Design a protein with these regions (language model features):
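Hydrophobic h-region of N-terminal signal peptides that target proteins for export
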Residues: 11-20
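Exported/periplasmic cell-wall-interacting domains
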Residues: 62, 79-180
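N-terminal post-signal-peptidase region of extra-cytosolic proteins
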Residues: 23, 29-30, 47-61, 93-101, ...
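Soluble periplasmic/extracytoplasmic beta-strand elements of cell-envelope proteins
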Residues: 24-26, 33-35, 47, 70-72, ...
Length: 180
């Protein structure tokens, strides 16, 4: 069941984006959840992992940026589940998933990539706060045991099955609101 807080956040997001696409994503960092919304209804809810460094916009901060974003690029549509991407290139290797809450030395980007571009000039777009130039993605992870807690280096991590499912439901241009 969606909590009242979620309904208020979703309503404010929909109001702010009423001139955009009907399908939207809201990331609620306080709940470590991602919501897929269409026609004012929550279609799907997924656990996520945002940055262990907290929230922030600055380049090299390793923090998850806040505000309104757009999916600028989608990478990996034909990749097999758990495929490792390095610099957005399919390595043709698959990750061994870690189901325990263990932080490894590897920060593999796996399965799918939805690369985000900030929409708010001076806040998450342009200069030293540009989410796109910071390579902020929604992506799969090898460290599935850490989903639900802050563990990333700025991106939004998801279970591999979930990110593949979400990838099929969104498009380039889908709006993404990231809130603390």
């Amino acid at each position: 069941m969606v909590k009242l807080k979620n309904i208020a956040l979703i309503s404010s997001f929909l109001f702010a984006l009423n001139s955009y696409s009907e399908t939207l994503i809201q990331v609620d960092i306080s709940e470590q959840r991602l919501y897929l919304i269409s026609n004012n209804k929550v279609l799907s809810s997924y656990p996520i992992s945002s940055s262990s460094y907290g929230e922030g916009q600055k380049e090299n901060s390793f923090k998850t940026p806040l505000g309104t974003h757009t999916i600028k690029e989608m990478i990996g549509s034909n990749a097999t589940k758990d495929t490792i991407f390095i610099s957005r290139i399919n390595t043709k290797r698959t990750a061994s998933l870690i189901k325990e809450p263990i932080d490894t030395e590897n920060d593999y980007v796996t399965s799918r990539i939805m690369w985000l571009e900030g929409d708010e000039e001076g806040y998450n777009k342009g200069g030293a706060v540009d989410s796109y130039r910071r390579y902020i993605y929604i992506h799969g992870t090898q460290e599935e045991g850490l989903i639900g807690v802050k563990a990333s280096h700025g991106c939004i991590r998801m279970f591999n099955n979930d990110v593949i499912e979400l990838y099929k439901k969104v498009n380039i241009g889908t709006k993404v609101l990231i809130k603390a």
